[in-house]
Amino acid sequence: MNQNQSFLAKMANGSLVLQILVGIIAGIIVATLSESAAQSVAFLGQLFVGALKAIAPILVFILVAASIANQKKNAKTNMRPIVILYLFGTFAAAVTAVLMSFAFPTTLALTLDAAQASPPEGIGEVIHTLLFKLVDNPVNALMTGNYIGILAWGVGLGLALHHATDSTKQVFADVSHGVSQMVRFIIRLAPIGIFGLVSSTFASTGFSAIAGYMHLLLVLLGAMAIMALIINPAIVYFKIRRNPYPLVFTCIRESGVTAFFTRSSAANIPVNMALCEKLKLHEDTYSVSIPLGATINMGGAAITITILTLAAANTMGVQVDILTAILLSVVAGISACGASGVAGGSLLLIPLACSLFGISNDIAMQVVAVGFIIGVIQDSAETGLNSSTDVIFTAAACEAAERKENAGA
């Protein structure tokens, strides 16, 4: 009994990153040795992702409502600079993708089988979807994981309770801490969950289907790597005026790795919240900025939309001038911000961008099909970049505001 308790204590107090690394290696080994065994442990990954997705909506709703209700008068949340960073970062990602596409032109061997899906017809439809998600029924928003609606109702309830009695505010604060404790427990199960995810992914997909699109994949991953390791650190340095890499690597290690394997920004919200708490950021700020970032901070999506659209243009022999490429960057940036409002995310927004070049919907949907083929890596890298950047920009804005206050004191 004592040995079992000792093992559980080591699991609870050990390095989560090292445990995740062990889970990844074990998953690859199991998938290599036995495909059937790997498929049989797939449920561990599904359980982990399911638990994260289940707790995330209530976590966001309670944290946002509690933080706004308990916010001190005249308290600064630094939301404006964070939103500016989110939007600028997304546009910078689209520009990076354009430059990578010009430097390494990509063409696609398009097939006749296009993915069966209904892409949005235009930016107006994306905005329409987002606006109606804003006024969604709060119960339905919690059930379906509509974070735009959850944010709206959480902010509304928080503002309504801002003038409530202290005892009412304390109840919400206590519930918030209780939900946070549940999140910490779920996150400690990450090594087991990622073991299941890696095992099933390698066993079912492997890399045979991806090999034919290696050039496209390298351009996509190269653009995301430049964004993560050069552009984002440069933006952070501009804000905090010190070496940005310790912060950047911490966020990639503790947020990006988990997001890479869960492939869900929504599922990674609890992980990001816990990381923000570990970094000692203001709860009033990160309780709003993290779920908001999961909705509008879509640098990875902007890269995917831009590179696949330009690959389609190259394949069809369309000449793309620099002004059209800049326009594509703007459209990709705006579309990416609405990716969470579209079923299928960034891939189904490709036809919208392709329409800029007069590329037919049939061809555009074949490009989407290519996206689904490489999605096992593309979607993972995209989510890892998107989710880790949420914490990076939130931390940078908080530190910049703190430095400014200290300088003025």
UniProtKB/Swiss-Prot annotation:
Its main location: membrane. This is Serine/threonine transporter SstT. The chain crosses the membrane at residues 14-34, 48-68, 82-102, 141-161, 192-212, 216-236, 290-310, 322-342, 357-377. It comes from Shewanella woodyi (strain ATCC 51908 / MS32). It is a multi-pass membrane protein. Involved in the import of serine and threonine into the cell, with the concomitant import of sodium (symport system). The gene is sstT. Belongs to the dicarboxylate/amino acid:cation symporter (DAACS) (TC 2.A.23) family. It is found in: Cell inner membrane. Keywords: Amino-acid transport, Cell inner membrane, Cell membrane, Membrane, Symport, Transmembrane, Transmembrane helix, Transport. One of its GO terms (molecular function) is neutral L-amino acid:sodium symporter activity. InterPro entries: Na-dicarboxylate_symporter, Na:dicarbo_symporter_sf, Ser_Thr_transp_SstT. SUPFAM superfamilies: Proton glutamate symport protein. It catalyses: L-serine(in) + Na(+)(in) = L-serine(out) + Na(+)(out); L-threonine(in) + Na(+)(in) = L-threonine(out) + Na(+)(out). The keyword Repeat does not apply. PANTHER family: PROTON/GLUTAMATE-ASPARTATE SYMPORTER (PTHR42865), SERINE_THREONINE TRANSPORTER SSTT (PTHR42865:SF8). Pfam families: SDF (PF00375). GO terms for cellular component: plasma membrane. One of its GO terms (biological process) is serine transport.
